[in-house]
Amino acid sequence: MTEAMKITLSTQPADARWGEKATYSINNDGITLHLNGADDLGLIQRAARKIDGLGIKHVQLSGEGWDADRCWAFWQGYKGPKGTRKVEWPDLDDAQRQELDNRLMIIDWVRDTINAPAEELGPSQLAQRAVDLISNVAGDRVTYRITKGEDLREQGYMGLHTVGRGSERSPVLLALDYNPTGDKEAPVYACLVGKGITFDSGGYSIKQTAFMDSMKSDMGGAATVTGALAFAITRGLNKRVKLFLCCADNLISGNAFKLGDIITYRNGKKVEVMNTDAEGRLVLADGLIDASAQKPEMIIDAATLTGAAKTALGNDYHALFSFDDALAGRLLASASQENEPFWRLPLAEFHRSQLPSNFAELNNTGSAAYPAGASTAAGFLSHFVENYQQGWLHIDCSATYRKAPVEQWSAGATGLGVRTIANLLTA
């Protein structure tokens, strides 16, 4: 390993020879980042991306001004999916170093898991990785159940079974119970539900290559809520939380589900499938039914659910939907505290009725007459939340993954959302 490049911080502008807008400069001692007080964390992250682009793979964060948030901003921009990087961290107090170490362990797990090829990360592997992560931070305070294949059908998990039956890799439901109270009868404070589609071809409503090539990341919601629970535990979560991951491949085969199929759920809802590429909501419905049965104070689901959310927000914000204004406000406050980008999009009662079917109670996709695709998807999910008007948040994870690098991120997963959800759980 080469000698480390020193990275220092300065509140003074760069020498004029570097240009009026220079955010970093290079000298005999290393690289200096020039903070301007306007968006220092963003500046650090963008500079780190440029430093990585220069091929510098060993750095030392040196001098005054570094804290956990600034170190983390550097790492978010510096980390990439290829090669190895080494950072020598500055001296931090014990609490800040522990916070940084937990972010490095858990949010890097989220990014690496989302980036993993679908060939090595199927439904069972995703569920087991989630169990391993949570068990590592929670020890014996965790119990779990994994249900897969035909057992899902026999137990009534018809959405998950229907979507996943076309793959040779069985669909899987992970139900994990984090109970730090030691009381088996303790009330459940929150339930987290994640979409874990480990590869999404679109099924018979097949995607074009340009839309399929990133679909190893369609389990980003499951990874995000798993990371959020783990991170909340490291921050002292002392309430009971249950995690439900709905994991499957969405593939084409002689056994795959088809347009016109009707799925009957355990809550009595019948859904006509008119787009096999709107599969995420079909598997989440099973998880939301289980979550509702726990009678928690809050339910949070996370999913890379719609292209419509990305059309509205790009890859820069997660989309938030809720009927509960107070709870939505709390999550947005948590996002602000954690410097993570969330934006609330509309969800109204009329979105719940914009999924008409001639043969069932619901269609799994909105018709051309109702083009608000992200809102109608949230409206669909609300039919599987018992008390959907209170205590329920839906996150359409549009900021989970980037197909190409940008000035502050490498290509691949971002890990955004983990800290916000953990903040809300521990508030």
Swiss-Prot record:
Keyword Nucleotidyltransferase on entry: no
Catalytic activity, as annotated: Release of an N-terminal amino acid, Xaa, from a peptide or arylamide. Xaa is preferably Glu or Asp but may be other amino acids, including Leu, Met, His, Cys and Gln
Binding site for Mn(2+) 2: K195, D200, D218, E279
Cellular component terms (Gene Ontology): cytoplasm
Binding annotation for Mn(2+) 1: D200, D277, E279
Active site: residue positions: K207, R281
Swiss-Prot/TrEMBL keywords: Aminopeptidase, Cytoplasm, Hydrolase, Manganese, Metal-binding, Protease
Cofactor, free-text remark: Binds 2 manganese ions per subunit.
Keyword Calcium assigned: no
Example of a GO biological process term: proteolysis
One Gene Ontology term of the molecular function aspect: metalloaminopeptidase activity
One Pfam family matching this protein: Peptidase_M17
Cofactor(s) listed in the protein's UniProt record: Mn(2+)
Subcellular locations according to the entry: Cytoplasm
EC number(s) recorded for this UniProt protein: 3.4.11.23
HAMAP family, per the entry: Aminopeptidase_M17
Homology family: Belongs to the peptidase M17 family.
Subunit relationships: Homohexamer.
PANTHER family with a match to the protein in the record: LEUCINE AMINOPEPTIDASE-RELATED, PEPTIDASE B
Role noted for this protein: Probably plays an important role in intracellular peptide degradation.
Name used for this protein in its record: Peptidase B
Species of the source: Shigella flexneri serotype 5b (strain 8401)
